[in-house]
Amino acid sequence: MNLEVTILSNLCYHEKYARKVLPFLMKEYFTTREYKIVFLEIHEYISQYDALPSLNALSIECQERTDLTEDQFKTIKEVLSELSNEKSEYNWLVDTTEKWCQERAIYLSLMESVTVSYTHLRAH
C-alpha cells in the first residue's frame, strides 16, 4: 500500500486523523486523477454530512459523476478496493502526512516555477 492509499484509507476510517489533516490536504497533492477524485469525494462527503464516508457511498458518488469514462470509473473502483481499515499509529500517520504535504507543495511549486521560466524564455 502506498502513502496516498494510506492517507485516503485513514480519511475514510479514522475520524480523529481525518479532522486533523483534512484542512491541509489539497487535491493537487495526489499524483493521479483517480486519487484526486477519491480525495475530492471524501472531502465533499465529510464537509456535507460531518461524517466519514463508507466505501459504498464513495462508489455511488463516483458513479454519479458525469466527468468519468468507464475506464476511469473502473480504476476508481480499484482504488476504493485498496482502501483498508488497517491501523496505523496516529502520531506517525499525522507526521508522515504532514511531511508528504510539505514535499508535494514544494515539488508543485518548483514545477510551476520551471514552467513559468520555460514559458518566459520561449517568449523572448
What are these regions (language model features)?
Residues A105-M111, Y118:
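A short N-terminal interaction module
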Residues M1-W100:
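Noncatalytic partner-interaction/assembly domains of nucleic-acid and motor enzyme complexes
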Residues Y45, V116-S117:
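Hydrophobic side-chain positions on well-ordered alpha-helices
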Residues I42, S113-V114:
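Generic hydrophobic alpha-helical segments
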Residues T119-H124:
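Conserved small/polar residues in nucleotide/adenosyl-binding loops
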